[in-house]
């Protein structure tokens, strides 16, 4: 008897193991490791999804002793998880403190985690006899409507290419199917047509001169269905169903590009990485100043991998925010590229996943989760802007794409490149110790482009001069100068909306979210106050909710308010605003950048999304309206993030022949992060910040574990937090430093109170067993409403 080892989709400590199920006779020899099934589970035999982890045979006596249940349904016609992904899940389980089923599900595309059916339809090669027997008068059949024997037969025919398969989800995530025609020239030449049937004669002549397969719709634009059916009945034309790629629009209008001539530093970097493919060398840190041509190096490294018969993954932070990067890779590699990111429609996501699964795509460009793309013969992975916090998933399973890439490189003997102008301190420290190979690009790729001049403007020098303005006189003068020269300006303000908060001047009440400990943000375009955490929204108050005073004032600033001020100061200027609110609609981000790139706007105002990867030769002025926004956040990485952001945004200026200028406004111009950013001095910042990290005992000198507890009742979360503290103190060695428990800086969101504990350690043998004890706390019945998360190397502390 055939047995399958299946892990079920019940993310609990007690069920984090494979269970044995009997494989029905109809599916013996067809079920494979990595396929999904429905199985009865628990006393009530509730049908739930599971993943096959192994197959084995058992004697009839052993099976009777175990009293195994049968698999109820096979969900896939082929494995949706590879052997590599199954190995990867087991390795990640050791560091992300998550259940194996949660890690496996993170590797699957979203549509496979939804409720759907499989729709089967006949392909051209299926005999008429089998078509009539299986489908009768129907054009297609739902897989779920068939008995087990018929399902097994359909699976065999699908594997032979005689049936087509369409995933049809409840929310219509499915294959896009079109009718195409195929011409049988031998039959067509023998068709007899009356001389009076001029349209049929015309259609025959067209088909004789255009015998290649094409969409039926293209014929029906000029000929009636009756005229086409005449040739179908004669056997001269066959109508077939074909899967159509919705992502085809990505490749339209993008001209093919050729490799650029590299400078000596770029060539050295490319050659070092390409030679490492297949030899399992340590990862590379490619540290290149802004404008040094890292992207062209990436392109040529990937070409080197393709030349060796290998595949490649490029990760980009928030890929929907960097359409220029996507276009460059499509221009170089064409339809070998698959795009995987959250900005795609559900249908597009499915199409791209299918391209990768079938081997039609050899290059994957995507955001964080694209690191799990099931590419075969993986040769190189590149993580662009490797310092970005978005590479760490902040929900379960809390993996870091960099650590996943290191494991995949180990499995495939692939090269791994971490690229950045401002590497994370952890990566730079590893390069300093020789754990990573350090490659540097110290000059701009365009020899005529110069590093822009950076000037810091002290806001305090202009106190008393229109204190409500976002703009100091030097910045206004610089904007006016660039507008007069017909050059473009980029302005960054890391806060969206109109004002930070609304306050009553009589009693000091600030309008806050009823679900979260956070002030509401004013949005004048919708005339609402919004919470950017839980989405709560209300109308702008006319009177104070506390004292009923009408003395309401708007404090702080935002991109919308800055936009209004710019429009008033420079009425002749064409201004574009780019933030989360103006780029919600699909394609709107691309449209705004295209508009700016065509010179249809003079000023681009936005949040930090404009700091990354934009390359416009006519941009000669970059202004940062307030460099202090992130400096004072309660996070030990706040200085590092401020330095990185300022350096990145400064790199948008002077990328071609025209000289660039950067103006940074700050209330704290002497802060070391701002001083080093002004001088574009990464190594100086690195040395200074490392001294602080060593003194305070933070990464990269120590590892960190963040534990967050959440509950509707504050007294309950405090009580459980101290229980966790007791477990940690009794389980961990004295060399580990345990901080907390304390309320999180934003202590309440979504009607839940949040407390956190931080563990700092270097070597801790008892870490795993102790944290498993902490996780066991959540399995107790009285803690059913407690939420507890364990985060290895947390990136955010708010």
Task: Describe the predicted segments one by one.
Residues 1-3, 16, 45, 486, ...:
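A general secondary-structure signal for short beta-strands and their flanking turns/coil
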Residues 9, 131-134, 694-699, 744-750:
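Short, flexible, solvent-exposed loop/turn segments with mixed acidic/basic and small polar residues
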Residues 726, 730-750, 775, 788, ...:
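A carboxyl-terminal module marker
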Residues 166, 240, 366, 492, ...:
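Solvent-exposed beta-strand sheet faces enriched in polar/charged residues
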Residues 1-364, 371-404, 408-420, 434-446, ...:
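Accessory, non-ATPase domains that flank or precede helicase/AAA+ motor cores in DNA-metabolism machines
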